[in-house]
């Protein structure tokens, strides 16, 4: 039987049901744009389930006994099986609001609320938005427009590795024994992504808050195009957060950095490419939890927390694991330790592409 929890399924990059999961992704995104949380989650859960199946769905009989599929999602699958496409999806793709909100939110620093505001003003293109003198852009949005072409192009694995080398070299100058780990989709074996995520820690507690120094060195070198440094608000006595989307409390930095052209893929007019990079610096005692959280996928993480809460009466987040029955924090040095605490088979990063 197939588990309702993504953390009990093995999901590689090999998706046998892309025609269905692509449709669900569009419907989920549209639901998100309409702030319909329930349907959005239902479509994402269904997509996640289908991604984990070792075979392609070829008839409605294949759906028998599968969890996570409601009437709405089954109707979409049925449509695609019969007509090769789903009319609901086609309607969304042709919808003016969907197209415009998707375009606006593709700008770094533009969220749903802002995109909605621009759409209500009657704007339909990025040019129209930028031409309006009444709009005051945030520092983040200005960077988003300035480097739009670079940032909206995919980042490939070779570029992520090149950035990794730069990060590693810089961090080592500050703390020779620091550990730098590439997280996110690239750690799960993806070939491309939208940004590059790194987790940094040091063997000695308290030495890990080194991002301001990294920023400083890069500013001197002229590597930084934009950055936003968020200081740590971590408190080790606080219980893990119940809300999935809550940002974690470690020191972190959202940046856009220059990658020299010979290191970047594809032909470009200038001799560098702007790439989005996120760094998180965490204490070594929390490293395993942060690594698990930042590796993803989001659906995998969401289900891992849901499993912990409902099946084990435990609270899990990017900082810690807390046993509500015993009223204690459970320590972990590795991701394997966390899976063991939860009584789950260990699932390696490349099988977490839920």
Language model feature labels by segment:
Residues 1-14, 28:
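Intrinsically disordered, low-complexity N-terminal extensions of nucleic-acid-metabolism proteins
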Residues 11, 33-34, 87-90, 293-294:
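Short, polar/flexible loop-turn hinges at active-site or ligand-entry regions and domain interfaces
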Residues 14, 40-186, 190-194, 200-255, ...:
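Accessory alpha-helical DNA-binding modules that contact the DNA backbone or grooves
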Residues 24-40:
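Short, aromatic/basic-rich helix-turn unit that serves as a nucleic-acid recognition element
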């Amino acid at each position: 039987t197939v588990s309702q929890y993504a953390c009990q399924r093995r999901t590689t990059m090999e998706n046998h049901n892309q025609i269905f999961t692509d449709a669900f992704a569009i419907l989920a995104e549209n639901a998100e744009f309409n702030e319909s949380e329930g349907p959005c989650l239902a479509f994402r859960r269904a997509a996640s389930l289908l991604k984990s199946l070792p075979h392609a769905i070829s008839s409605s009989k294949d759906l028998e006994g599968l969890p996570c599929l409601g009437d709405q999602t089954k109707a979409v699958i049925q449509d695609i099986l019969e007509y090769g496409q789903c009319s609901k999806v086609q309607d969304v793709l042709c919808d003016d609001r969907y197209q415009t909100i998707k375009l606006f939110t593709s700008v770094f620093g533009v969220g749903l609320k802002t995109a909605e505001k621009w759409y209500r003003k009657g704007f339909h293109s990025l040019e129209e938005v930028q031409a309006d003198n009444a709009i005051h852009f945030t520092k983040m949005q200005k960077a988003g427009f300035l480097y739009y072409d670079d940032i909206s192009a995919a980042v490939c694995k070779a570029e992520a590795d090149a950035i990794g080398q730069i990060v590693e070299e810089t961090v080592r100058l500050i703390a020779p024994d620091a550990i730098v780990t590439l997280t996110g989709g690239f750690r799960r074996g993806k070939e491309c992504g939208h940004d590059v995520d790194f987790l940094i820690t040091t063997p000695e507690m308290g030495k890990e808050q080194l991002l301001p120094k990294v920023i400083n060195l890069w500013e001197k070198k002229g590597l930084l195009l934009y950055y936003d440094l968020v200081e740590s608000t971590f408190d080790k006595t606080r219980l893990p957060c119940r809300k999935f989307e809550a940002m974690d409390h470690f020191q972190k930095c959202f940046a856009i950095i220059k990658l020299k052209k010979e290191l970047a893929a594809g032909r470009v007019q200038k001799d560098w490419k702007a790439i989005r990079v996120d760094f998180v610096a965490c204490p070594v005692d929390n490293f395993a939890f942060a690594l698990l959280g930042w590796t993803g996928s989001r659906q995998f993480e969401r289900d891992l927390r849901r499993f912990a809460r409902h099946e084990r009466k435990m609270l899990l987040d990017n900082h810690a694991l807390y046993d509500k029955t015993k009223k204690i924090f459970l320590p972990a040095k590795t991701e394997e330790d966390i899976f063991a605490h939860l009584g789950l088979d260990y699932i390696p990063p490349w099988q977490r592409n839920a």
